[in-house]
């Protein structure tokens, strides 16, 4: 499995993703990342996007993982 981008926060976090093609973009906390990697159903912020850039905002302390499925290469930044 490829390296999954993540960011740690003690409050609010935003991510901006630039896609080349339509893709599923998920921002998940540590618990839901573990569920995702073990094939269980998981809760996420995001969804299927056909337009770029994608912006997702979350609030909550901890580590957040960015998962991009399909769409080929992408660029991202947490802020």
Q: How would you name each of these model-derived features?
A:
Residues 1-79:
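Acidic, Ser/Thr/Pro
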């Amino acid at each position: 499995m490829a390296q999954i981008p993540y960011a740690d926060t003690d409050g609010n976090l935003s991510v901006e993703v630039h896609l080349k093609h339509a893709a599923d973009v998920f921002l998940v906390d540590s618990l839901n990342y573990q569920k995702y990697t073990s094939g269980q159903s998981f809760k996420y912020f995001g969804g299927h996007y056909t337009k770029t850039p994608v912006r997702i905002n979350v609030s909550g302390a901890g580590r957040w993982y960015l998962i991009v499925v399909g769409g080929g290469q992408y660029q991202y930044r947490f802020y």
